[in-house]
Regions:
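A glycine-rich, hydrophobic loop/mini-helix early in the fold
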Residues: 21-78
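Charge-patterned, long linear interaction tracts outside catalytic cores
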Residues: 148-186
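Gly/Ser/Thr-rich loops at beta-strand to alpha-helix junctions
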Residues: 14-18, 74-83, 102-105
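Charge-biased, low-complexity intrinsically disordered regions
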Residues: 42-43, 55-60, 108-111, 115-118, ...
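Conserved active-site and cofactor/substrate-binding residues in soluble primary-metabolism enzymes
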Residues: 3, 22, 45, 49-53, ...
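Long, charge-dense
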Residues: 85-144
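Short glycine-rich or small-residue beta-strand-to-loop segments that form or flank ligand, phosphate
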Residues: 11-12, 68-74, 97-100
């Protein structure tokens, strides 16, 4: 059972611009409806560095001992930069929550990864395995959202509103920093 007032780190990547090989990664530390901090890093578009960058970003922050949940809007950020949820949980000793409006279709993401690998001559097998492993967790539908996590359903019900709001704010910051003004939905 999670304690009341748990700190969530919401992760959002900036927009993908064809002229750039990287984008901003924003982390918002959120607790009880309050933004307590903002973290940032640069990640490769369609790269394989998102998990390591998130781990490094958290470990060097003053919030490292307080963050108990890392939330993302999907398992792939900055295009096809796939998160290794298990590695993040082990290295940071946190829970991970993937929250989406629509139920993800594993087949579509796997097909996109394979096409990307074939087109660029890149080995994407480790990313494909990360997607398959994450999807073993299944999805819970709560409050109109799909959540994927190792947390039990009662804990998910307690935090999904905070997780969504923190992701919304992280998304606004990432877009605002990149474009000079925020726009769009998560």
């Amino acid at each position: 059972m999670l304690k009341k007032g748990v700190r969530i780190l919401a992760i959002a990547s900036g927009p993908i611009q064809t002229s750039r090989k990287s984008t901003i990664l924003v982390g918002v530390v959120f607790r009880d409806g309050t933004i307590e901090g903002v973290l940032s890093e640069s990640i490769a578009v369609n790269g394989a560095d998102a998990t390591e960058k998130i781990v490094r970003m958290v470990l060097r922050s003053r919030f490292r001992e307080q963050i108990k949940i890392v939330a993302s809007n999907g398992i792939a950020i900055a295009g096809l930069n796939v998160l290794d949820l298990g590695l993040m949980e082990r290295r940071l000793r946190v829970h991970t929550v993937v929250l989406t409006r629509k139920k993800p279709h594993e087949g579509e993401l796997l097909m996109a990864l394979r096409r990307f690998g074939e087109a660029g001559g890149k080995n994407v097998e480790s990313r494909i395995e990360e997607v398959k492993t994450a999807n073993l967790r299944g999805f819970s539908r709560i409050g109109g959202f799909y959540l994927q996590s190792g947390l039990d359903k009662n804990d998910l019900k307690a935090i999904y509103g905070q997780a969504f709001e923190s992701l919304r704010i992280a998304h606004l910051i990432a877009k605002g920093v990149s474009y000079g003004e925020s726009k769009g939905r998560i």
